[in-house]
Amino acid sequence: KNIQAKKSKNISCEKVNSFLGGGIYDHFIPSAIETIVSRPEFLTAYTPYQAEVSQGTLQYIFEYQTMICELTGREIANAGMYDGASAIAEAILMAVRKNHLTKAILPATLNPNYVKVVKAYTEGNGIELLIAPEKDGLTDLSALENMLNDTIGSVIIQTPNFYGNIEDAKAFDTIVHKNPNCLLIACVDPISLAIFMPPAEYNADIAVGEGQVFGNNMYFGGPLFGFFATRPEMARLMPGRIVGGTIDKDGNKAYVLTLQAREQHIRRAKATSNICSNESLCTLSAVVYLCL
């Protein structure tokens, strides 16, 4: 009774619409999701080193990648990231691998929690972060244009941004891609892509975001999962695992981990990232959510 009395002092998201959370939100979750992801065949995020024995796990990751590609319009996606924040950070690191330019511009309208994670990832890698100011809750595009030069390797756009406002994505494309070596990284709310322009339509080179809204509870702040998609020519620079489809010697469809030479269990310190299976169970929730 004492615990119930203390609990009753909390304001539940079941009773009110909460606009708190900084990227973690309360959405309707069909009961079928928990039933499916709780099955013993799925209830692990671990991919065996002989991954091909787990065809079911590889297939749902493949389907997840396909869905992320359909949502973002980009041609290749990985198996997931830790969260939206780490996805942005890894995108900046990937941009450096692509163009060898070590300056990145973050908008002042970016989720401040994401900024903290990006700083943690980039400080030890010699990457300089610049902040584009905001004006009336949106990125100041004139200021952004003045900041751009040949030393800038990537620019981030978050839309909807931390304030809930929709950025002018086409303007970002025009400004950023005046420098052909600079990459535009779009951080998007995946549910918004049902009605808003997908990142590929404004030429975002990398599309990332937080996927918690797809069938995952708030869980007091985690676990979460991030999604990551890009152009096919940058596939070998991507972080994380990639599942590909193929045909076995008997002519049956099969799934395999592909481009593994990028990964930490193969190259260790020379890998594109130390991320591996990470949040795969959360991505399964997303797959079931999108299928329903």
Spans of features found by a protein language model:
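Flexible, glycine/proline-enriched loop segments at strand-loop-helix junctions
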Residues: P48-G56, I76-G80, T102-T109, Q158
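Conserved PLP-enzyme active-site core in the AAT-like
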Residues: S86-D250
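Short, Φ-rich (hydrophobic/aromatic) sequence segments
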Residues: I29-Y46, Q50, S86-V96, S285-L292
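N-terminal entrance/gating region of PLP-dependent enzymes' catalytic architecture
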Residues: K1-E63, I266
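Active-site C-terminal subdomain of aminotransferase-like
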Residues: F214-L292
